[in-house]
Amino acid sequence: MKKLKLICVCVLAVLTALTAAGCHKKDEIAVKTGNIKFTSAYYMCALINADKEAKSKVTEELDDDESTEDIDYYSKKIDGKKFVKWVEDTALENVKKIAAYKTLCKKADLELDEETESNVDSYVEYYWTNYGYSQYYEPNGVSKETYAKYMKDAYYSNLYFEHLYGEGGEKEISAEDVKAATFENFVLADKLEADFSSKTDEEKASLKEQFNSYVTALNSGEKTFEEVYKEYNGTTDTEETEETDSEELKPVNKYASVLGTEDTGYASDYFDDASEMAVGEVKLIELDDDAGLVLLVKRDLAADEYYVKNLDLSSRHLLKDDEYEDFIEDYVKKMDFEIINYAIRRFKVKNIAEPSATA
């Protein structure tokens, strides 16, 4: 009789578990506001991204003598919050912000253009296939289609930002202020690098001699940077030929790199060095700990319309990101959200599966 009771209890437990699991539909809604709905898989995508962001923050805050391996993330705090709580709050907050972006864009009759959507699709396809994103998201219930939707929706933020602060926008920033921010936070330089890792002392000496010869040739006018670049990289004109629209704006210095301050998307360790150089000046930097060499040739950013134009939006963000973020946060507070806890609480931060190192 006792055995029969035990069997009945076990069967009941299994049936209960199966029933509970079966109650979660594939496209169940987790967050709603107006006509905008987000599925539980969409929320899970936000949770995974928040978890990655949190772990990155923890790693950045480690002391120099602390190991980056086997970190007990869940024992850490971020901005005064326990790790799990921070991840959960950030994920939900990001979903709400996306709802705000989409709502505001709809009111302003704004939609993503075909080029943006196509670029996102290409990005997703590339990283899903080549960078193991499929092994990260799929085991956690996020399909490629859901990830692509999340990425596209995130672009509504930039779309509305441009609507407000872009040229002709409701809160347009003056061209003078934009250019001032551009020239304050970015410089343009031709850059050639040599990595000394795994190099013998003899190879290092040879590279130093080679780079010093480039400095001499550049300063004397014997060689252009293009010639130096091709010689060092072993490239030819044929290999670099590309078909481009003849009317398309092209850079004056096609080999140049944008070097930015730490607050930009172009943050560079060599920004300060390049900033102090005169246009046309050549400088050879020997990296600390004999890590390598960097050859810089300062270029005139102000004279290169291609780069000035491409840095326009980045400069506007530098000037107005804080204001925009405050505006969105206030807007979110005024929105009515329905949070379906049943659909959200099924996901646990500590249960997020990460791809194995051997995958």
Question: What is each PLM-predicted segment?
Answer:
Residues 1-8:
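Bacterial N-terminal signal peptides that target proteins for export
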Residues 23-29, 274, 279:
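Short acidic, Pro/Gly- and aromatic-enriched capping/linker segments at domain boundaries
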Residues 48-55, 92-111, 125-133, 152-169, ...:
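Sec-exported extracytoplasmic/periplasmic mature domains
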Residues 25-142:
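N-terminal targeting/tethering segments
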Residues 18-22:
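C-terminal motif of bacterial Sec signal peptides marking the signal peptidase cleavage site
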Residues 82-86, 90-99, 111-118, 146-155, ...:
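Soluble non-cytosolic domains of exported or imported proteins
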